[in-house]
Curated annotation (Swiss-Prot):
Its main location: cytoplasm. This is ATP-dependent protease ATPase subunit HslU. It comes from Marinobacter nauticus (strain ATCC 700491 / DSM 11845 / VT8). One of its GO terms (biological process) is proteolysis involved in protein catabolic process. Residues 136-158 are annotated as: Disordered. It holds the Pfam family AAA. The lineage of its organism: Bacteria, Pseudomonadati, Pseudomonadota, Gammaproteobacteria, Pseudomonadales. Keywords: ATP-binding, Chaperone, Cytoplasm, Nucleotide-binding, Stress response. Belongs to the ClpX chaperone family. HslU subfamily. A double ring-shaped homohexamer of HslV is capped on each side by a ring-shaped HslU homohexamer. The assembly of the HslU/HslV complex is dependent on binding of ATP. InterPro entries: AAA+_ATPase, ATP-dep_Clp_protease_ClpX, ATPase_AAA_core, Clp_ATPase_C, HslU, P-loop_NTPase. ATPase subunit of a proteasome-like degradation complex; this subunit has chaperone activity. The binding of ATP and its subsequent hydrolysis by HslU are essential for unfolding of protein substrates subsequently hydrolyzed by HslV. HslU recognizes the N-terminal part of its protein substrates and unfolds these before they are guided to HslV for hydrolysis. It is found in: Cytoplasm. One of its GO terms (molecular function) is ATP hydrolysis activity.
């Protein structure tokens, strides 16, 4: 679990997301409260439930990006799902309990990787010995003492040095490896993914103990053998127990597109698939027990963050019980021309840096003048205002259109340097941005 302070979390989010300070503060506080709760006595800890968050804002302003970046910072089981993927229990499709099952799978995978990394040095030593045994097999008539002498011989040490320096990477060896199984693929009806995964697990376990001699290069064999040796050092039962605890105490679920399952105000009929999903989410968010292949998981202390654009519906169109379980409301603001300018240049791996790097692979040094950045931002903002507002995603469309001819000609190395100026932006995009009919279809 991450022990970062709210200020540190916001600072990390600022590297990738422009503006939306209120939303960043809300998720930073929620993440820090997870850590604070774990410092308390167990009696008080059980009484403190997470304050779930509802993020409201137009598309393309950073709701999903906040979730993506938060997943990397959390150092806890984190799952992002779309509310539209689920259907009411009893109907064809995935039921909401599969969210917790997927979260448990994520936790097991995360903890297994951490454990394998912890045992990396021991696994590497064991892998080196197996590779050296394949390179320098001991004579058959050697007894145990002779083998021990051979292990410490100068020849073996010389080969070990060469192996570590990569001089033997291209040499082919024959080595005994665990069989990867037949790769049984089972197609199941929607809503029966749990049964499918259990059947696949059963078939893979049947062949997991079989071993097969393979011929491969030392570099490839080292990776396979190292993973095999690390897996031997990992206690799977302990990982499963830790995973259940991690999900129950620190799990975070981000539910995107929650507005798509809200019943619209003008539609008075009871829509089964929409309202049913909301009602199924209630016990999950409030606290219930879900059965998974690792054991039962209680959802009382899992943090839920929901988000939606709410273009065609309002937060009040969600059923009242669900509204009550999302007590913290955060409104994300629509982007301004200044925000667009900052998005183009400020974040790590910004759009401008990406295009400069892509053109650099063709030997073209691409630069953007300050007035060009401002003009691109104005065009994106104007098109958003006159057509559909798709937020920062409009910049991708505008930049692709702007640099289309340069991208096409760059392979022929027409020029070594190219500066995008405001005049060039006007030449390529001026007519399109002015003509609403054209921009509606092209930008």
């Amino acid at each position: 679990m991450s022990a970062m302070t709210p200020r540190e979390i916001v600072h990390e989010l600022n590297k990738h997301i422009v503006g939306q300070e209120e939303a960043k503060r809300a998720v930073a506080i929620a993440l820090r409260n997870r850590w604070r709760r774990m410092q308390l006595d167990s009696s008080l800890r059980d009484e403190i439930t997470p304050k779930n968050i509802l993020m409201i804002g137009p598309t393309g302003v950073g709701k999903t990006e906040i979730a993506r970046r938060l997943a990397k910072l959390a150092d806890a089981p984190f799952l992002k799902v779309e509310a539209t993927k689920f259907t009411e229990v009893g109907y064809v499709g995935r039921d909401v309990e599969s969210i917790i099952r997927d979260l448990a799978d994520m936790a097991v995978k995360m903890l297994r990787e951490q454990e394998m990394k912890r045992h990396e040095h021991r696994a590497l030593d064991a892998a080196e010995d197996r590779i050296l045994d394949a390179l320098l097999p001991p004579p058959r008539d050697f007894n145990e003492d002779s083998q021990r002498t051979n292990a410490d011989s100068s020849t073996r040490q010389l080969f070990r040095k060469k192996l570590r320096e990569g001089e033997l990477d291209d040499k082919e060896i024959e080595i005994d490896l665990r069989s990867s199984g037949a790769g049984v693929e089972i197609m199941a009806p929607p809503g029966m993914e749990e049964m499918t995964s259990q059947l696949q697990s059963m078939f893979s376990n049947l062949s997991s103990d079989k071993r097969k001699t393979r011929k491969m290069k030392v570099a490839d064999a080292m990776k396979r053998v190292k993973d095999e040796e690390a897996a031997k050092l990992v206690n799977e039962e302990e990982i499963k127990q830790k995973a259940i605890q991690a999900v129950e105490q620190n799990g975070i679920v981000f539910i995107d597109e929650i507005d798509k399952v809200a019943k619209r105000s003008e539609n008075t009929s009871s829509d089964v698939s929409r309202e049913g999903v909301q009602r199924d989410l209630l016990p999950l968010i409030e606290g219930s027990t879900v059965s998974t292949k690792y054991g039962s998981i209680r959802t009382d202390h899992i943090l839920f963050i929901a988000s939606g654009a709410f273009h065609l519906s309002k937060p009040s169109d969600l059923i009242p019980e669900l509204q009550g379980r999302l007590p913290i409301r955060v409104e994300l603001q629509a982007l301004t021309p200044d925000d667009f300018k900052r998005i183009l240049t400020e974040p790590d791996a910004s759009l401008v840096q990406q295009y400069e790097a892509l053109m650099g692979t063709e030997g073209v040094k691409l630069t953007f003048a300050d007035d060009a950045i401002a003009r691109i931002a104005e065009v994106a903002y104007k098109v958003n205002e006159t057509t559909e507002n798709i937020g920062a995603r409009r910049l991708h469309t505008v930049l692709e259109r702007l640099l289309e001819s340069l991208s096409y000609d760059a392979g022929d190395q027409v020029t070594d340097t190219f500066e995008v100026t405001a005049d060039y932006v006007d030449e390529k995009l001026g007519e399109l941005s002015e003509d609403e009919d054209l921009s509606r279809y092209i930008l």
